[in-house]
Every structure is written in structure tokens, then in C-alpha cells.
Amino acid sequence: MGTQDPGNMGTGVPASEQISCAKEDPQVYCPEETGGTKDVQVTDCKSPEDSRPPKETDCCNPEDSGQLMVSYEGKAMGYQVPPFGWRICLAHEFTEKRKPFQANNVSLSNMIKHIGMGLRYLQWWYRKTHVEKKTPFIDMINSVPLRQIYGCPLGGIGGGTITRGWRGQFCRWQLNPGMYQHRTVIADQFTVCLRREGQTVYQQVLSLERPSVLRSWNWGLCGYFAFYHALYPRAWTVYQLPGQNVTLTCRQITPILPHDYQDSSLPVGVFVWDVENEGDEALDVSIMFSMRNGLGGGDDAPGGLWNEPFCLERSGETVRGLLLHHPTLPNPYTMAVAARVTAATTVTHITAFDPDSTGQQVWQDLLQDGQLDSPTGQSTPTQKGVGIAGAVCVSSKLRPRGQCRLEFSLAWDMPRIMFGAKGQVHYRRYTRFFGQDGDAAPALSHYALCRYAEWEERISAWQSPVLDDRSLPAWYKSALFNELYFLADGGTVWLEVLEDSLPEELGRNMCHLRPTLRDYGRFGYLEGQEYRMYNTYDVHFYASFALIMLWPKLELSLQYDMALATLREDLTRRRYLMSGVMAPVKRRNVIPHDIGDPDDEPWLRVNAYLIHDTADWKDLNLKFVLQVYRDYYLTGDQNFLKDMWPVCLAVMESEMKFDKDHDGLIENGGYADQTYDGWVTTGPSAYCGGLWLAAVAVMVQMAALCGAQDIQDKFSSILSRGQEAYERLLWNGRYYNYDSSSRPQSRSVMSDQCAGQWFLKACGLGEGDTEVFPTQHVVRALQTIFELNVQAFAGGAMGAVNGMQPHGVPDKSSVQSDEVWVGVVYGLAATMIQEGLTWEGFQTAEGCYRTVWERLGLAFQTPEAYCQQRVFRSLAYMRPLSIWAMQLALQQQQHKKASWPKVKQGTGLRTGPMFGPKEAMANLSPE
């Protein structure tokens, strides 16, 4: 809230080594006599069922690749491909085809409950799409369909992303901030050309596609001899070229570098091709990288697109390539396709060709001599509706049994952006280092090609401690790093903050707000690619572990922004879709649900979410308090704590009104008033009540740190009364009841009932003198969840269902109680690890990873939710970043063994050394 098959085995392959011939296929171009080339023979491949039985091969990741590599028929392992990650044969087909959650998946009883909401939503949706001509923040009518094609995205944090599928296609685009286009651009390809003794013997597009355009190109690569391996932020694709004794390994690199606030912002990606000649003949190898200017279709409509070659030499390093200028308003950009020039390589180009034609001119140009013609000058700007593409080619000679390297980069420069309301101009973070003028694409390309080796060293230093830890399962190593894709590909923006854009009157009590935002910028990521709201705070509660552990300054920046928004109000009244009630957009001293919609003007207009009036939600204020203390605890930043303390006091004061009977425990309001916004909660509840007690306990700690004895005494009294009420009203001997209402489902086992304890333990609290929930109750509840929500659900193979009835049947009382929420499961697993149930934690989390990444084909688009059968909901969602809470729990367990912090009796305050980033993350961060 995962794409195709490497193929035509090529040219000049002896008949005994061919798979089958596809010359009759009208979509495959089979040149005959062309100057300087031999007859180029095209081969094709059929499925294993047609010609050979499927078999396991020893080339798979021996620990973990499972069924995803069954189809692989090659023997090549590629050049320096790591053993851990997500690996899949390009010929693999996922058999299970699920559909997005729709109204027809709602039970009759739940549909009756939500009929008013449905009618109001339809009315609002029609007005938004047909009258305002805008896109809904959640489009329940047109969900993104299943496409099991996605791989690692390209691009750093906040500069836009381009996702390359696991079959090599460029297929998901987020260049305009927060707005996604799911379109495979056929012209965006890599093509290989092999020449022996001055003649081309093999030329193949490295794509399984057989498109209706560019038909002169040799498409239909055989996927049974290639595989993809992802370990974000890097990915490898290995192509074995049967009959050629050549193996290609393409390594894709993006600068995602923990604790780095410069290179991590760059909108670039690097492709390093390592070519291995396993034969006894010398050969010439060329790789051509072709790229369309824009995405085609409506993207071409305005016209005025043009390309030009460039060459940039700095510090003895030369980079050549093409600039693809896309001046379409309101967010014009320039794309750069470039290659590094070395003593062993030749870089050539073709400035412009028609990507909607047969492509014969480009194909013949490469076929003729393995190089492109390299015309000078810029192309003519296109007419309206006409497409344009270009290509860059790198060539090198390869000795018998030799190896060579060809290096490409892809960069895009969109320095100034406007969100959908077109009200303000914003500058991306990378402009601090590369300028705001829109002419940085050559410099970005040069920088990427000269620095990628250093990036890889830093990535390896960061990841190696986890990858080398033999106590950790292989699936976890893949999940931990690959789920990080969302930090860059979550519609993410990282913006410069202008000094005059911060309101003086609101920020005057936060002394370090301005320096933080000035030095580290403003960060926003979507709740999900389909749930278009920035920094959705009830969900960020789960996802924030990745940010605080890897880019803590961005987490603090986000917290300052949230504090600013909390102190503001917007009394504009609007109708909320669930209740139909008119209420203000935002009330003062309550945490907003989100910071805004990228199709509007985020940060200026918050709370794009209008299903519920979240001013009455019970969890948002509590989650702010808990995250503030957690962030202080892990960073040791006392200035941050001092700045946030008054805001914490204000939001807790707002929360007090929900304790209507003054027993020290808040009550839910009889509707879905928390992150489970389709699951009604009444009275004291396990989830919100637990978060409340945890937040009160944290207030006691912060009051002591801030020297506020009266406030410390006040919250200590509330905590004492609340603990007694929580245990009396909710504990049943095995777990905490869902809520304390008289409804049958009030005794449901909620998988997320220990969320408060989870955060306390992450903050070094929740045991000994700071115990809030009796340890034996917490452990017993977790054991019950494991027995019922995990093992009694789907054979224990799909994670933990949100709600389970005590007799082992999923709770179907709401549209969310019988879902599995991946991010909640990872948080639950972290809680289990914290409480010593490490085996249970890994078993629980593994079910989600196997389901999403190996069974449903949802790699790099992990959804918010799935049910036991048929459906998923909200692809590419923020919450699964909570897997980093598992890593924190593991590190804290290791830290405990090394040095347990001392606790002063009676206060619960640590007097020992701070468990901060240098200690907590020593095995992850080279810094």
C-alpha cells in the first residue's frame, strides 16, 4: 500500500548447438547478405515442456532460489554475482495470478456496513476525475493491475526513479514527483553485437519482447539461458549466449549509501557490462544502449523534443553520450545516456531515430561494423506526436579466454519541480551539488561513471556484516536489503528548503528546526504508489526504522516537518467519506495523517486523506511521542529532544480527552479510529491502549530528561492507573483481547497487539524498572499469536493474519481483519526477537517474504496487504520497511550480551553509555 526471457541464441551457431529455428517467425529480422557480415542466423527457444524436462541446476543460489530458478538451462554463474539476494530465471512464469482488492471482494455484511461510504466515494471520485480533472489520492475504481515484472529501481533518494524489470525492460517511471507511469518503453534496450575476423556473427536485443515496432531488430531472447539477481541497490543480469562461448554480466548500480546525504540524492544509475570470452577465438564485442526521449504516447504529444551528443573530459577521464532534451512543462528535464571512454573502448552514437518505425537504419548501422555512425550536431525538434530516440554504443576487443568491461550511465536532470497544484517551485536536493540550471546531466554522468567503484566499496562494507552472518537465513538477507527499494521508489522527494519558506511564529520554539531543514533538506515518501499521500504518519511509525537506522538526519527532518504541521490548523470544512460528517481539514495540536498529495501542494496543504477525520484517531499522537523518543535514543541528539518536548506535551494533552472515565487508559470511539481504518474498535483496546501506555511511559522518561518533575509525576500516576486498567479489562490469560466491547469479535487475537511493547523495547525500555506490560504476558501473547495467527493460518506459510478468532478461524468481521499486512508482520517478528522468540520471529516473517517475492511475483512492489486467496491490496507500500526493526532487534540482542546499560533504581533512566547509532549499528554502517 516483479519480467521476461533472454533469447535468440544468435548468429552463426552450429546447427548441432541450436535449440530450434525461428526463421518463419515474421517478427524476427533475419538479414542475409549485408556488407561486412556473415549470414546472421536467428534461433529461438521453446518452453521446457516442449523440448526438455525442467530440472534443478546447481547454479541457483544454493540456499534460497527455489522454484524461481528451475527453468534456468545455462551453466554460467556470471561475473562476481553474490550468493545472496533475489534470483530468478528470465524464463520463469508465476503460476498464481492475483487481482487487486475491489468492491466485489467485500462480503455482503461488510458491504452493507460501508454502503454510505461507497456512495459518497463514488460521488467524490466522479467530481475529482471528471470535473477537476485530477487523480484521486486513492483510486478504488482503477487499481494498478498485477504485473509480475519489476526489479531494482534506478536513481538515488528524492530525484525520481526509473524501475528496470527483471527481464530488462524499463517499465515504471517516477520522474514527476510522486506520480507514477507504468509503461514499458520498447526502444529502451541493450543490444549485443559480436564480430569475429571482421564479420558480425551475432546481434541480439537482450529482451524477451517481440514488439510490433522496431521489427527489423532481432528480438525474442531465450530466457532459459539468463537470470536476474537483485540485492538492492545493485542488481545483476547474466546472459549465457549459447553457441558463442560468451557470457555477459550486466551489473546495475544506484548510489544508495547509508549516512550519505550527497551522493545518495543523485538521479543516476550505472550499468557495468563484464564480457567473458570462453572460446579460443578473439572477438570484438559491442553493447548498444538505446533510449527513447520520454515514454511515448501522450508524452510525445507536445513535440519539441530533441537530442544532441556530448563529450565531457575532467581530471583525465572522458565520458561521451547523448542528451535527450524533454522540455515539456511544468517539469522539463534532460536525460543523459553516456559511456566511459577508456584506452580499450570506443564510444559511438546515433543522435536520433524513430522509435515507432522498423528501426532498420540503426540495426544495419550496428550490424555493419559493430559501431554507430556518430553524426555531429543536434537533432531537429520533433513535431507534435512524433517520437525520437537515440543510442550509445561501446565497443572493445576481447582476447581468447579474455574478459573486458564496458561502462554506461543513465542520468536525468529535473532540478526544478512543481507539484500538481503548480503553486510553488521546489528544488531537488542534488541541485545543492550540481546546480539548478538544468544543464547538469553531463556532469552527473561523468561523476557517476568515475565514482561508482567507490559506491560499490561502500555498499559492500555496509552489507557484508549481514551477508556474512551465517546465523541469518538467506531469505532474510534478500528481504532486508531489497525492501529498501521503497525509500527511493516511494514517490520520494528530497527538497532544498528556502530560508524564507519557514514560518517564524511556528518554529520559534524549535531552535534547531531551521538548521536541520537547511542542512539536510525536506524528505517525503508516499504511503504507497497507489495511496498517494506523503509521510502518512500512522504507517511511517512502522517504516521509520529504515530511515532512523540508515539516514537518521532525514528522519529528524521529517519529524520537524511533522511538528510544524501539528502546530498549524486549517479550519476549512469538508465532508469525510466514511461518516459523511463535515469537519475541519486540520486541527491544531494533533498530528496530521499525512503531509499532503503530490497532485496538490504537499506541506502547504496537509491531510489529503479524507476517509476519516483523523483528528479523532487514537494512534497518531501516540506514535509521534514514541518515535520522538526512539529517534532521540538512537541518535543521542539532545537538541532534537528539547525541540520536540513541547510538541509532545501538546499532543498528549490533546489525547487526554479520549480517557473519558479517567482510569488512565484511553478508549476507542466505536469506529475505525486508527491505522486499521476499516476495522472498528470500541472502548479500551489492545492496540491503541498498548500504544497509549507506551507513550505515557516514554513521557515519564522525557520529563525526567528535561527536568520537568511535575510532569514526570503526572504521567507516572497515569501510567500506574492505566496499567491496572489495561490488564484488568483486556488480559484473558492467553493474550490481550482486541477490545473491551460486547461484540463477539472483541476476543479476536490481533497480531499487532504488542505494538507498544515493540517500541518500548526498541527504546531500551519495557523491562526491569521500566516494565509496562508484564513480561510473562507479552511472551504468552506472542506465543498465542504464533500458534493461531501464524501456524493456524494458511499452514503457517503466509505470515500472520491480522485477526484470528480464539478457535482458529480468521476474523472476517471487517475488510481488514482477515488480511495479512506485511509491514505489521515484520514488526511482529521484531517483537518476537526482542522477547527471545527468535525462531518464531523468523518463521513468521519468512511466510510473508516467500509469499510476496517467490509465490505472488510482487518483487519490488510489496503490497500493504494480501488475503489467504485471490487478492492483494495497495502495491508498493511503505509499511514493509519495518523489516529494519528486525535488524535493530537483532543488533540490540547482540549489544545486550556485550554491555547491558545500567539503570538507576526507581527512575528507569539509563546512566550507562548511550546505545546510539555508533554502537547500535556498528555492524551495518562503515561510519
From Swiss-Prot:
GO cellular component terms, semicolon-separated: cytosol; endoplasmic reticulum membrane; Golgi membrane; membrane; plasma membrane; smooth endoplasmic reticulum
EC number: 3.2.1.45, 2.4.1.-, 3.2.1.-, 3.2.1.46
Gene3D superfamilies: 1.50.10.10
Activity regulation (record text): Inhibited by AMP-DMN/N -((5-adamantane-1-yl-methoxy)pentyl)-deoxynojirimycin. Activated by Mn(2+), Co(2+) and Mg(2+) and inhibited by Zn(2+). Enzymatic activity is dependent on membrane association and requires the presence of lipids. The membrane-associated enzyme is not inhibited by condutiriol B epoxide and bromocondutiriol B epoxide.
Domain of life: Eukaryota
Recorded family membership: Belongs to the non-lysosomal glucosylceramidase family.
Role this protein plays: Non-lysosomal glucosylceramidase that catalyzes the hydrolysis of glucosylceramides/GlcCers (such as beta-D-glucosyl-(1<->1')-N-acylsphing-4-enine) to free glucose and ceramides (such as N-acylsphing-4-enine). GlcCers are membrane glycosphingolipids that have a wide intracellular distribution. They are the main precursors of more complex glycosphingolipids that play a role in cellular growth, differentiation, adhesion, signaling, cytoskeletal dynamics and membrane properties.
Protein name: Non-lysosomal glucosylceramidase
Taxonomic lineage from the root: Eukaryota, Metazoa, Chordata, Craniata, Vertebrata
